[in-house]
Amino acid sequence: MTIGYRDAAGDPLFPWLMEIKNSMEDLYAGKNSGYDLDKLLFDCISTYKKDSRYRNDLRFLKIWFLYLEGREDFERVYREIEETEICKGHSLLYEWYAIFLEVKGLWRRANSVYQTGLSRKAEPFDRLKEAHSLFLQRISKRTKASSLEKVGDDAQATDLETGFVNPWETSTVNGLIHKIKPQLVKYDGYHVSNKVFPGKANLSSLQNYSRNKIIEIGGRKYQMKGCAGQGGFAQVFKAFIDSNPDEVVALKVQKPPFPWEFHMYRQLDCRIPDSQRSSFGLAQRVHVYSDYSILVCDYLSHGTLQDVINSYVVVGKSMEEVLCMYYTIEMLNMLETLHSVGIIHGDFKPDNLLIRYPPENLTETGFHEKTGSWSKKGLCLVDWGRGIDLSLFPRTTEFTGDCRTSGFRCVEMKEDKPWKFQVDTYGLCVIVHMMLHNVYMEIEKKQSLDGGYINMPRTSFKRYWKVDLWKELFTKLLNRETCEDDTETLRNLRKSMEEYICSDPKLMKKLNELLAKQRISLCSS
């Protein structure tokens, strides 16, 4: 590291710079020990660390780093640099320390330093952003192969401080499926064949078949009742088992075969408490052939949250705030439960949230605890093809893939930063915005009280809303500086909204009326 100089007049740091320069030259020539240089650096720092003239002086920052590089307690030294706010607004503070950490193999910590600098808008900002992007590219290349070798291997997981992995990349998914294969074949309802689908029906053209067509899968006969959904690789059909209208299922037909989603469903069976299990979809069985896989799931007939939102859009109205808040509580509770057991959905959007209705009328009792009829009410999260099982990765793994779903790319994806739980919580924010405003969410940087910037929706809140609750939700979920567990944040947001609704009997009464009205409207359409 080289040190620059300027005129010594009125600059008491200048003689120290000259002495440090001479000491470094002597050290390289073998004329003194490193101890002499360390003492000189320490004395210089102690003399001027509280001198405001040098708080934003890059020469002084370089002296700090010369001292830091020779210390085993470098983290303590860096904390002191932060506490004394030396060059806090300059990108070189973060770039130099991140490079130092990267060389030591402390990649996760290095990434955190870059993120801190970016969140503070350190200048030159574009230089720091480019340095961070290049860092992610380097780490991605280094960890791509090694992270897959560590999947499911707890003994080796600690060897790698962190990995940056695309969880949806074909090679990643195939590696995971290979690792869990011994477990996969033991799952109840898992049926595999190395042959092509033996049925007479062409599964690729099922949508063209007439209603009531009978196809046989795994010894059972299914009466096709129509297409319920279609994606890039899969089609979902409504069907009756043995032509019995009381046994309705959803058949998800996918090519090429994709057993991963069934693994996610069985992990939900294992990890989610029985009292909440019906909120996350149920898979009965899967048939995996060499050309197709067919996933058999429970079928819910009451539409999706997207249908509810659309019912307001078509009449030019926005959803009532108390109903928005109710569905927000549902989603917060879902993600709190999922993330606490190490599961990420990865495709959290309104058309993957099915509506659930109880068989009997709702009562106010049990709203907080989701007991009685409330336990059968709410939402059901389905489509687990992009689900992430965190137990299969080292604990500190962070993700770099892009979901490429318009309107649902989280801030980290847009800014080329690693993410974890943000992929779900950003989806939640988009859905809440759609319920409140009838449009997708657009993000803008707004100045915060501490002089920095935070991500917030561009569209303003209406004055008569409970603005403090909505502002808190978007502020906390759109501005997470780390990829650490977010369950406490989700829980606190949920409880605040629950307490607000329960504080006024009129709100609870109105909510019941709106849910009853919604049920009549959707079921009759």
Swiss-Prot record:
Report if keyword Transmembrane helix is assigned: no
- Renumbered to this chain, region (Necessary for kinetochore localization) spans 1-138
Summarize what activates or inhibits it: Autophosphorylated when the cells enters mitosis.
Report the source organism. Answer: Arabidopsis thaliana (Mouse-ear cress)
Q: Which InterPro entries does UniProt cross-reference here?
A: Bub1/Mad3, Kinase-like_dom_sf, Mad3/Bub1_I, Prot_kinase_dom, Ser/Thr_kinase_AS
Q: What is this protein called?
A: Mitotic checkpoint serine/threonine-protein kinase BUB1
Q: What is its EC number?
A: 2.7.11.1
Q: Which parts of the sequence form the motif Nuclear localization signal?
A: 50-57
**Which gene holds the coding sequence for this protein?**
BUB1
Q: Which reaction does it catalyse?
A: L-seryl-[protein] + ATP = O-phospho-L-seryl-[protein] + ADP + H(+); L-threonyl-[protein] + ATP = O-phospho-L-threonyl-[protein] + ADP + H(+)
Q: Where are the transmembrane segments?
A: none
Q: Which residues form the active site?
A: 347
Gene3D superfamilies per the record?
1.25.40.430, Transferase(Phosphotransferase) domain 1
Q: How does it assemble?
A: Part of the mitotic checkpoint complex (MCC); interacts with CDC20-1, CDC20-2 and CDC20-5.
